[in-house]
Design a protein with these regions (language model features):
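Alpha-helical cores of eukaryotic small-GTPase signaling modules
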Residues: 2-22
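Carbohydrate-active enzyme catalytic cores, enriched for enzymes
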Residues: 23, 27-193
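Active-site rim segments in enzyme catalytic domains, especially the processed small/beta chain
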Residues: 180-244
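A residue-identity detector for tryptophan
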Residues: 6, 78, 99, 125, ...
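Residue-identity detector for glutamine
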Residues: 5-7, 17, 51, 157, ...
């Protein structure tokens, strides 16, 4: 008998947490594309559940659609041109504990994004593997999460560079964010020439070896990172000053 109140309470919590979870440029605040995609997928499922059960539309904040549209565009801009090659398995960067996404996995998500935003031509282009007008090739700046994307096209032969210059307060041992300012990946003509080292190990608080490994993985030298000079802090385990 209290179902409507539970629905309202649950959705109010989601509305509140969503504003905290996503940065103003659309990226989730732990800066991991892998978890970003999962969170967007969960919110898509929630919206579908509300629609299928014919629940009140105002359970979710009207601002949520704006947040989700930005979030879907993050995935779009982070997708390598290899996505347009049939059977491709390396279609996304591996920054901040991210598993590399395959063409088929990304397409399943773009299909959902296009359902949420059926009038968006860019998402339709991604859903259909390149039918219609491609997104533009301007430099894409994600100033709040610290990512910069440069590309000269959306065909498999294109060149694309993703540069990571993250600043995050979530740098404790459990964080997905690495201390890897200056890390980059460079794609050209069907190949990623500088794939990041990606995922190291899940956290185990009582396992000293695992925790030391995670801290070691935070070092600049564990990633494809551009540095100026050979500073001592580049070699210390997980102690780089990310604000430099």
């Amino acid at each position: 008998k209290n179902a409507p109140q539970w629905q309202k309470t649950g959705c109010n919590i989601i509305n509140e947490q969503t504003t905290k979870l996503f940065l103003r440029d659309g990226m989730t605040n732990d800066l991991s594309l892998h978890y970003h995609i999962g969170i967007v997928d969960g919110l898509y499922d929630l919206k579908r559940l509300i629609q299928l059960n014919k629940l009140p539309d105002n359970l979710l904040s009207p601002e949520l659609d704006n947040v989700l549209l930005k979030a879907t565009k993050v995935v779009m801009h982070f997708t390598y041109p290899s996505y347009f090659i049939k059977g491709s398995k390396d279609c996304s960067p591996a920054f901040n504990d991210s598993w590399i996404k395959t063409r088929s996995v990304l397409n399943k998500n773009f299909v959902k994004y296009a359902k949420m935003f059926p009038d968006d031509s860019e998402l339709d282009y991604m859903k259909t593997y390149g039918k219609g007008t491609p997104p533009d090739t301007k430099i894409k700046t994600f100033e709040y999460s610290g990512f910069y994307v440069l590309r000269n096209g959306w065909t498999p032969q294109s060149t694309m560079l993703v540069h990571s210059n993250n600043v995050s307060s979530k740098l404790e041992d459990s964080s997905h964010n690495q201390l890897d300012n200056g890390t980059f990946e460079l794609y050209h003509n069907g190949r990623n020439f500088f794939p990041d080292s990606g995922v190291c190990s899940y956290m185990k608080e009582n396992d000293t070896e695992v925790m030391e490994l995670r801290r070691w993985f935070r070092q600049t030298k564990a990633h494809n990172t551009m540095v100026l000079g050979q500073l001592e802090e580049h070699e210390a385990t997980g102690t780089e000053d990310i604000n430099k």
